[in-house]
């Protein structure tokens, strides 16, 4: 069996461990490394209880490369799935180089102090590309759903449907409801920072930025209906800009009025801040206090009801004529919970990262260098995520459907991929 290591112990790491235990028992020998051993023990005990699979657990701060390298060597890790916070990425990547194992993650690196990082992103990771190439090791960056699967949708579209792609809009709409007034689907500090930062998008070969919640569109989407989506800075815009330099590229996400108004109120009173303040004898960042008071993201799963649609809408040219396509997936919170006890966000990040790990170790995605998902062959990967539990579809769109009216309706004429 292939030896892989999960680094991290949050919502996504838990879902990934469960998915590996349920669907890849005879494929992987899994270990888990977490900053807090008690959390690691809890995940491993959960996996053993539910699936009868033993996952070895270890304690190490992912930022402590001096301890992480010998630990990976003792485990004889062949691949690391880094699901810790984004500030750990560079140190874990360097640890993989020193211990000679492949690497995957699900987001871009950002230091804990970073805020409003100017585009383009990924410059820190790119500096390690030569080292991965020389070592003939593979690092696949940001292989979740969005970013990740959506990047592969774009590669699939270019391969099969377009001579030239001129516009790429990535959409994420969660119409789910749960028992909590204000909660995030993954690490609150990371999720809230993303929404409070300026948005960045690509147009006419140039980078543009705009204040948060200042750009919006209303879409009617498969499975979730009509929603107002906001432009938010997101990883896939920055990597896809290299593959499609002429295209207008932007990411849009649904944020409910209640969530947005609450977030903006918390920001105005200073609770969405990473600058530490003194409270009695304690020196603490307000965001850490808020995160401690918010529900744990994994706790949303049992009460979550509804669906999530993630889609990529592409416009361009095919054989000299205008052409538009949509690639998308609709997932149910209830179905994801029934499968591995996770909500959609956790489930649809675990599935692609496991698929990528399999394909690297099988050789199909063993690029021997540092790459983004859109640089790899999408066909086997998109088939593999279906095998692991995620379906997707593709459909042509008419000119009327993608026109910039008050409502962009992309629901009609669905065709299975």
Residue ranges and their predicted role:
Residues 9-10:
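Glycine-rich Rossmann-fold phosphate-binding loop(s) that bind the pyrophosphate
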Residues 13-14:
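N-terminal Rossmann-fold NAD(P) dinucleotide-binding loop
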Residues 107-137:
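Rossmann-fold NAD(P)-binding glycine/threonine-rich loop
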């Amino acid at each position: 069996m292939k030896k892989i290591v999960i680094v991290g112990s949050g919502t996504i790491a838990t879902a990934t461990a469960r998915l590996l235990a349920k669907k890849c028992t005879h494929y992987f020998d899994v270990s888990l490394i977490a900053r807090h051993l008690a959390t690691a023990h809890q995940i491993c005990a959960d996996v053993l209880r539910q699936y009868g699979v033993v996952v070895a657990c270890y304690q190490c701060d992912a930022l402590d490369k001096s301890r992480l390298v010998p630990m990976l060597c003792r485990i004889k890790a062949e691949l690391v799935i880094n699901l810790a916070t984004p500030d750990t990425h560079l140190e874990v990547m360097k640890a993989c180089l020193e211990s000679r194992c492949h690497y995957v993650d699900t987001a871009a690196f950002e230091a804990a102090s970073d805020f409003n990082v100017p585009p383009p992103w990924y410059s820190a990771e790119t500096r390690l590309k030569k080292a991965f190439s020389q070592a003939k090791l593979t690092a696949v960056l940001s292989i979740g759903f969005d970013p990740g699967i959506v990047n592969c949708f774009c590669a699939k579209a270019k391969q099969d449907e377009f001579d030239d792609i001129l516009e790429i809009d990535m959409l994420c709409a969660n119409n789910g409801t749960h028992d909590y007034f204000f909660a995030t689907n993954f690490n609150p500090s990371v999720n809230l920072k993303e929404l409070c930062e300026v948005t960045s998008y690509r147009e006419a070969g140039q980078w543009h930025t705009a204040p948060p919640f200042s750009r919006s569109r209303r879409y009617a989407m498969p499975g979730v209906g009509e929603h107002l989506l906001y432009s938010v800075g997101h990883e896939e815009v920055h990597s896809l800009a290299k593959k499609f330099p002429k295209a207008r590229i932007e990411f849009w996400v649904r944020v409910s009025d209640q969530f947005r108004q609450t977030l903006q109120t918390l920001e105005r009173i200073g609770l969405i801040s990473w600058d530490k303040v003194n409270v009695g004898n304690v020196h603490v960042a307000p965001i850490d206090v808020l995160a401690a008071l918010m529900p744990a993201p994994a706790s949303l799963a049992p009460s979550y009801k509804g669906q999530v649609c993630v889609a990529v809408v592409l416009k361009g040219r095919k054989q000299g004529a205008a052409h538009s396509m949509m690639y998308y997936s609709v997932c149910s919170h209830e179905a994801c919970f029934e499968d591995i006890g996770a909500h959609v966000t956790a489930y649809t990040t675990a599935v692609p990262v496991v698929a990528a790990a399999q394909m690297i170790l099988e050789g199909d995605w063993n690029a021997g260098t540092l790459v983004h998902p859109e640089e790899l062959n999408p066909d086997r990967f998109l088939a593999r995520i279906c095998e692991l539990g995620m379906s997707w579809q593709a459909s042509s769109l008419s000119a009327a459907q993608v026109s910039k009216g008050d409502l962009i309706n992309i629901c009609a004429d669905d065709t299975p991929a």
